[in-house]
């Protein structure tokens, strides 16, 4: 017989971890289910050494540091954590929800979905023979191992710009983007323009030059032109973003806006008792940032507590008054 939880949180990224901690502070019985092999979501797995700029009060905070702080905060409570476990169905029963997963089943009074963009994998570089090259990378692990190496980065979003600025401190760095304008925070773009990073726009990669195992040069072609250039490099980083999959979400019977769960001001979905927070939810004016999701977590938790027991106030005491 499965234990009955007050709140089951689907997703163990930053927003899910904070929601679990906050739920414990409301003395709820909580568990976390995550399809990934470790806690922390994208910041922990894809950006462990990248600085995160939208967590107030913590300058120069990396994805790994954020994850470790949230886990440390949660470790003060007993929280069952189910990793490598994918939620398949969420069924409403008389007084609780039955969650069917790839490994079993769970009973819970309420559900908070904090699954971000879902399962993710990097958008690949689509050039001939790309699979064989060992020095083409899609994420950064231990940035110091690239010190003094010639680094080239492909992409024009926040990740590409931020990594270019990070690599510039330790290595000769080139950034290639197919457009003249970057899709990144204005402050970061200004810092890039004032940096020593070699910027190649509007160029796109056109040919890999190497022995099939080690890439030595990258040919780039100017957009809408036959003009080409060749870049010498030791490592190539592809920052084209990620393909996300929400998996079985569409089968959970919730109203969606494209692939996001529509919520009201309580962070409640179209099914009473099921809430959504972070990048997986949608409402008018929604901004996808870690900081936004962290703020949505207490709203969902407090309303879940009130759903379980209407005698419990939605507005709790402030932690400073406890």
From Swiss-Prot:
One of its GO terms (molecular function) is flavin adenine dinucleotide binding. Binds 1 FAD per subunit. Its cofactor is FAD. Keywords: FAD, Flavoprotein, NADP, Oxidoreductase. Its EC number is 1.18.1.2. FAD binds at residues 34, 42, 47, 87, 120, 279, 320. Transmembrane segments: none annotated. It comes from the Bacteria. The keyword Protease does not apply. InterPro entries: FAD/NAD-bd_sf, FAD/NAD-binding_dom, Fd--NADP_Rdtase_type_2, Ferredoxin-NADP_redctase_2. It is an enzyme of class 1 (oxidoreductase). It holds the Pfam family Pyr_redox_2. Homodimer. Belongs to the ferredoxin--NADP reductase type 2 family. This is Ferredoxin--NADP reductase. It comes from Streptococcus pneumoniae serotype 19F (strain G54). The lineage of its organism: Bacteria, Bacillati, Bacillota, Bacilli, Lactobacillales.
